Regions:
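Glycine-rich phosphate-binding loops of nucleotide-dependent enzymes
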Residues: 2-271
Length: 271
């Protein structure tokens, strides 16, 4: 059982190998505490998605394997469990790419997330109303096929489906990807509300570092399959390397293509 002192999610020095030969994660460690929003920052290919899949054990579906280290959730070692077992424990991953069941209506898509509730019709109905409370747009679109709704509505549907399973923690992979700035702000505001009001922990894998650090309490910067920097969000947002390489800022403010440098200051963690 997690407490304020012990993490709800503890990733300890994990290594992930694909196809028995491709080393993707190299000693990744991180903690997420109960009710915390933490973020994984990094460029495409840094290892963020693989880290989430290693935690949720979806990496096995892609011929990957956690070959070293451990993953603990709510005080239990889970890296040898199957993904459905983790869902029943309250660890839910929202995949990159806004996956929905295109042939189902929005409401039926949401209800697929309630399978762990079994025959608890009352609880399922209450959960559905809770989801509609956070995403009123989904209530309006409840009868529409998910294959014909907007990208923002698909993302809302994917998060809502995860909420139906009574999560203790949600792993969100690139929730801002492909969305207009106003929709990104709306999605992140709802993520914050879910965290505060429903006490759902969040681990966000996000290339949009500015948005992630705005809403997260703690962050981890990944590069080439390793965590190279971590700290509370405010400290990371003020870090010179994070500013230049992930926020697009320099000592004189935002970068302009007119003033683009023909060199980069070497990252301190590569020195």
């Amino acid at each position: 059982m997690a407490t304020e002192q012990t993490p709800l999610l503890k990733v300890n020095n994990i290594e992930v190998i694909y196809e028995h030969v491709i080393l993707v994660l190299k000693g990744v460690s991180l903690n997420v505490y109960e009710g915390q929003i933490a973020s994984l920052l990094g460029a495409n290919g840094a290892g963020k998605s693989t880290t989430l899949k290693a935690i949720s054990n979806l990496v096995k579906a892609e011929r990957g394997e956690v070959t070293k280290g451990t993953v603990e959730f709510d005080g239990i070692r889970v890296d040898r469990l199957f993904a459905p077992q983790l869902v029943k424990m309250g660890l839910i991953q929202i995949m990159e790419g806004r996956h929905t069941f295109e042939h189902l209506t929005v409401e039926d898509d949401l209800l697929t997330g309630a399978y762990t509730r079994g025959r608890d019709k009352k609880g399922t109905k209450a959960a559905l109303e809770m989801v509609y409370g956070y995403f009123p747009r989904l209530r309006e679109r409840r009868s529409a096929k998910t294959g014909y709704i907007s990208g923002g509505e698909m993302q809302m549907c994917a998060i809502g489906r995860g909420l139906m399973a009574k999560p203790k923690i949600m792993l969100l992979d690139e929730p801002s990807m492909g969305l207009a700035p106003l929709l990104v702000e709306e999605i992140f505001n709802i993520i914050r509300r879910l965290n505060k009001e429903e006490h759902v922990g969040m681990l966000l894998a996000e290339q949009n570092a500015a948005m992630a650090l705005k809403y997260a309490e703690y962050g981890y910067v990944m590069e080439n399959g390793r965590v190279v920097l971590d700290g509370d969000a405010a400290t990371l947002a003020d870090n010179a390397d994070v500013k230049e390489f992930y926020l697009g800022l320099t000592a004189v403010g935002k970068k302009s293509y007119r003033d683009v440098k023909h060199y980069h200051r070497r990252k301190r963690w590569l020195a």
